[in-house]
Amino acid sequence: MAITTIRMRRARSAFTFSAESSSISVSAHQTPLRMTTQYWLVKSEPEAYAWADLVRDGRTAWTGVRNYAARIHLNAMQRGDRVMFYESVTTKAVVGIAEVTKPAFPDPTADDPGWVAVELKADTPLAHPVTLEQIKTDPSLAKMTLLRQGRLSVTPLTRAEFDRIVKLGA
């Protein structure tokens, strides 16, 4: 008896097809969408929501994002992804590391259900904030989306960029 298991990239269930009985069954377990961690940077004005607020709260829904490019990034975030927390305007520095604990869901602060939020939890503060000036002058960070699309509030990071910021902040 030949049994084939098909895992669909976007599907959350595994489908099993048995050629002998021509039957299809759907398993009850959840399958991961991907096996690798992704890395992100989120920006917040400290007067609105600072790193200290996330540490105090433990976790928060990252709401209020109303930029189409940032929405694409929020939709791509998955549980376990690592997130650099950047305080903009006054601090202008990466100050901590958070983790995605809940992937994209409808933003409760939006009238349009197309806008999404993710849930983040505070993980690790950086011992030394990594300033925008440090990022701009570090050759290994020269291609960061933060530098090319400075007004974007949610941006992807490469693993190398993430690791370099961690090293600079140690």
Question: At which residue positions do the language-model features occur?
Answer:
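Short, charged beta-turn/beta-strand-edge "cap" motif at the junction between a beta-strand
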Residues: 86-92
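Short glycine/proline-enriched turns and hinge-like loops at secondary-structure junctions
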Residues: 53, 78, 93-94, 111-113
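N-terminal, intrinsically disordered, basic low-complexity segments enriched in Arg/Pro/Ser/Thr
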Residues: 1-34
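Short acidic (Asp/Glu) patches
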Residues: 63-69, 102-109, 139
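Short beta-strand-centered aromatic/proline hotspots
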Residues: 93-103
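Compositionally biased, charged N-terminal/linker segments
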Residues: 25, 29-79, 169-170
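Contiguous surface segments at macromolecular interaction interfaces
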Residues: 32-47, 107-170
